[in-house]
C-alpha cells in the first residue's frame, strides 16, 4: 500500500506557489489576448497597454470580493457587471488572464514528463486521422466494446480540491472559487446570458474541464497499471479461492524469489484499449465480458466515491464489437465480417471453404451531416439545397471560393470513408447551393445560370484527392478511380470542421 501511495503522491518539486501576483502583470493579459481561443469582438479595440494595469486589476478583485456570490437573485445576476453583456470589459480580461495563470503548473508538468521520458515530438500523432489508423490495426482483433459518456456535473468544491494538488497558492484558489460560484449562479439567468458567458470564457472552463478529465484519467491509469492487485474482496468467503492464492504465493516464493507482481501481470488484460473523444470514451477488449464488467464496476465506484457523481451502472453497456457501431469524430466506425468462399479440388474431391475476415469500416453518417448543413442554411430539413441570402452581397469569386473551401475541407476530412455515396451527396448539396446563391444574386433562374457557367464550374468542385490522383494516373482512369474510392487517412488534420462537429 505504501508503494501505491508513493505512486499517487505528486512530485513536490513540481508544485508551484505564488501564482496570485501574476494577476498584476500586464504581459499575462497580452498573452491571453493573443491566444486563439480568446478571439472576440470585445478585444478588437482594446488597448492592453493602458487597460490592464495593476490598479484596475486590484479594483476589480476588490469589487468581486465585496459581493457575496451566494445570495445573488435572478435580477441581480442579470444586472451584475461582472457577467453582464459587454458592460465591463475589464472583468472579461481578468477572467482570461486568470485562465492563463492557472495553466502554468500543468504546462510545466507536461514539459517535465516529456523530458523525463524522452518522448519524441511526432506531429503526425496529433492528427485526428491517426486515431482511425490505430483502430484499423487493433479493433479487428478485439471482441467487446463499451461506449460511455464521461460524467462532468460535479460539485464546485471538488474542482477546487483537485486543483489544490497543483496550485498551492490559497489566494488563487479563493479567486477561482469566486469565479465558479458566479458561474453557478448564472444558471438562473436567461439563456442568452449563459450563452454569452460560455463564449466569453472558453479558456477558463475548458481548463477546468480538462483538469477534471486529467484527474480522472490519472486514477484510471493507476488502476490499469495495478489491476493485478485489485482482487475481489467478496471471494474471501470461498475457502477454495483462499487456498488457491496461498498455493500460488508459496509457488512464487519457491521458484521466483518473491516476485509475485511479475506473475500476476499475466492476469491483466493486455488487449484492453481506451480512447477518449469529445467528452466520451470507449473501452475495447479481446477477452470475455468478465473483464469488461470488472472495469465497469471500477469506473462506477470511482465516479461515485471519489468525484461524488451519481452514475448508474446501467448506462455502461457492454456490446459485441461485430454488432455495434461507434459514432465519433464525424465517422461511424464498425467491425464487419466479410465472408468469402474458396473452391478447392483435390483429386476427385471438391471442397468449398468459407473464410470470414474482420474488416474495420468507417462511413459518413449522412443524417447528422445534413442536419449540420441545415443549421448552416445550405439545405432544408429534407436535404434539398437552398441559397444563402447572407452571401449575395459578396462578389462571385468570393462566393465560389467559400463554397469550394467548405467542400474540399469536408472531402479532405472524410477521405477515410469506406463508402463515398454520402460524401457525393454532401458535395451535390454544396455545389447546387452555390449555384442557387449566385442565381439569386443575379436574379436569374438556376438553369440559365448553369448554362452560363458551363461545365468548367462543376469541375471546380473536384476534391484535392481526385486532382492528385489524376496527375499520377493520367491515362489509367479506372485505377485512379479505384484508389480514390478507397480509404485515405491524412496526418495533417488537427481540428474538426464546424460542419463535422455535430455531436
Swiss-Prot record:
Keywords: Chloroplast, mRNA processing, Plastid, RNA-binding, tRNA processing. Belongs to the intron maturase 2 family. MatK subfamily. InterPro entries: Domain_X (IPR024937), Maturase_MatK (IPR002866), Maturase_MatK_N (IPR024942). Pfam families: Intron_maturas2, MatK_N. GO terms for cellular component: chloroplast. It is found in: Plastid, Chloroplast. GO terms for biological process: mRNA processing; RNA splicing; tRNA processing. Usually encoded in the trnK tRNA gene intron. Probably assists in splicing its own and other chloroplast group II introns. Its main location: plastid. This is Maturase K. It comes from the Eukaryota. GO terms for molecular function: RNA binding.
